[in-house]
């Protein structure tokens, strides 16, 4: 099953098992996901569900967005997300339908995608876990520098993709095979074991694990 949901990271806490074992969990609020468009092979060339969730101020909605939401008869949400469907998935789901966290009731593990926390401009040691150079023994300037980044006159350049200093974080990250600890349908909460990408209140895409 590839149908997933959009949630919001509430934060982390812990729960205790009957044996008294402490389990760190991330609490994800999964409010109703409203279907705004159903894409088909005939009209779009592929099958997918487009959903929205949450709310958005009227003065923050562009005219194209307003027209799109009005056409689907769905309240404007804080964004639009699309999930591809394979043959046999999503049959019977129509525009205006609402998907809730109960679809994970029988799911053991999930993959969670979000935007990682931005760290700004960082050096090679922090960004790529490079080893530091000697703190003494004659080294007084290059303790945390990258070291050699190329060869000589041949090739006479630095290869593309070379791990160097630069902007760290603020990129799309997926954490796979997180165990579903609890599904709270009444409060629209999903508890998964461990940490998920991103900061508090960040949007998350939750899907059944592909490697489970």
Curated annotation (Swiss-Prot):
Modification N5-methylglutamine, positions: 153
Family: Belongs to the universal ribosomal protein uL3 family.
Keyword Cell membrane: no
Function, in words: One of the primary rRNA binding proteins, it binds directly near the 3'-end of the 23S rRNA, where it nucleates assembly of the 50S subunit.
Self-association state and partner proteins as the record states: Part of the 50S ribosomal subunit. Forms a cluster with proteins L14 and L19.
UniProt cross-references to InterPro entries, sorted A to Z: Ribosomal_uL3, Ribosomal_uL3_bac/org-type, Ribosomal_uL3_CS, Transl_B-barrel_sf
Region of interest: Disordered: 136-155
Name of the featured protein: Large ribosomal subunit protein uL3
Molecular functions (GO terms): rRNA binding; structural constituent of ribosome
Matching Gene3D superfamilies: 3.30.160.810, Translation factors
Keywords: Methylation, Ribonucleoprotein, Ribosomal protein, RNA-binding, rRNA-binding
Organism of origin: Shewanella baltica (strain OS155 / ATCC BAA-1091)
GO biological process: translation
Post-translational modification: Methylated by PrmB.
GO CC annotation: cytosolic large ribosomal subunit
